[in-house]
Amino acid sequence: LAKTVPLNDGTNFPIFGG
């Protein structure tokens, strides 16, 4: 399942797993 994690610069980083 893909999720997006908000980074400090305001962008979203996609992660896979969990």
Curated annotation (Swiss-Prot):
The keyword Iron-sulfur is assigned to this record: no
Keywords attached to this entry: NADP, Oxidoreductase
GO MF term (any one): 17-alpha,20-alpha-dihydroxypregn-4-en-3-one dehydrogenase [NAD(P)+] activity
Class in the EC hierarchy, top level: oxidoreductase
Enzyme Commission numbers on file: 1.1.1.149
Catalytic activity: (17R,20S)-17,20-dihydroxypregn-4-en-3-one + NADP(+) = 17alpha-hydroxyprogesterone + NADPH + H(+); (17R,20S)-17,20-dihydroxypregn-4-en-3-one + NAD(+) = 17alpha-hydroxyprogesterone + NADH + H(+)
Chain's role: Specific for the oxidation of the 20-alpha hydroxy group of 17-alpha-hydroxyprogesterone and 17-alpha-hydroxypregnenolone.
Subunit-structure text: Homodimer.
Name used for this protein in its record: 20-alpha-hydroxysteroid dehydrogenase
Native source species: Tetrahymena pyriformis
